[in-house]
């Protein structure tokens, strides 16, 4: 009898943990879906809502390291001044790995289908749960 109760308790703990992990991963995937939708509507301001709105946000790209949400937004506006330059964005997630209760590491590919020529590359994202919200705190895209 005690073994049965212990087994049930262990199963309940595991089920709770798995559910919490699945909920976090689904939320992170939803952030990326929202970013894709905003991009494809030509709305960089909404696209940036997936990022940590802080001066410590780190973005690493072909121009080097950029710190800060506002500076990252300005760089996006310079690099993608209109919807022709933005094209249509698609993410392909290769890995979504939990590092701890408050951090996830995401690896994927990005692709822009554009009338002026398609481009694409790879990315790594560090998501952090801040004030109960998952946001990108570091983005390395190439």
Where are these regions (language model features)?
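Short beta-strand edge/turn micro-motifs at domain boundaries
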Residues: 120-142
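A solvent-exposed, acidic/Ser-Thr-rich amphipathic alpha-helical stretch
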Residues: 44-99
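A mature extracytoplasmic/lumenal domain signature
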Residues: 52, 63, 95, 109-110, ...
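Hydrophobic/aromatic beta-strand elements that line small-molecule binding cavities or substrate pockets
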Residues: 76, 91-97, 110-112, 122-128
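Short, low-complexity N-terminal intrinsically disordered segments enriched in polar/charged residues
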Residues: 4, 8-50, 71
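Short, cysteine-centered beta-strand-loop-beta hairpins and adjacent loop/turn segments enriched
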Residues: 83-84, 112-119
């Amino acid at each position: 009898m005690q073994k049965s109760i212990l087994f049930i308790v262990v199963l309940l703990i595991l089920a709770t943990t798995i559910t919490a992990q699945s909920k976090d991963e689904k939320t992170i995937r939803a952030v990326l879906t929202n970013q894709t939708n905003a991009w494809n509507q030509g709305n960089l301001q909404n696209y940036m809502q997936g990022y940590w709105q802080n001066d410590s946000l780190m973005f690493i790209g072909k121009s080097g390291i950029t710190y800060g949400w506002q500076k990252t937004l300005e760089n996006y506006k310079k690099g993608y001044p209109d919807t022709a330059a933005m094209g249509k964005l698609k993410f392909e997630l290769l890995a979504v790995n939990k590092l701890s209760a408050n951090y996830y590491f995401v690896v994927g590919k990005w692709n822009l289908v554009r009338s002026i020529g398609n481009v694409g590359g790879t990315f790594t994202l560090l998501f952090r749960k801040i004030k109960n919200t998952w946001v990108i705190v570091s983005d390395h895209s190439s």
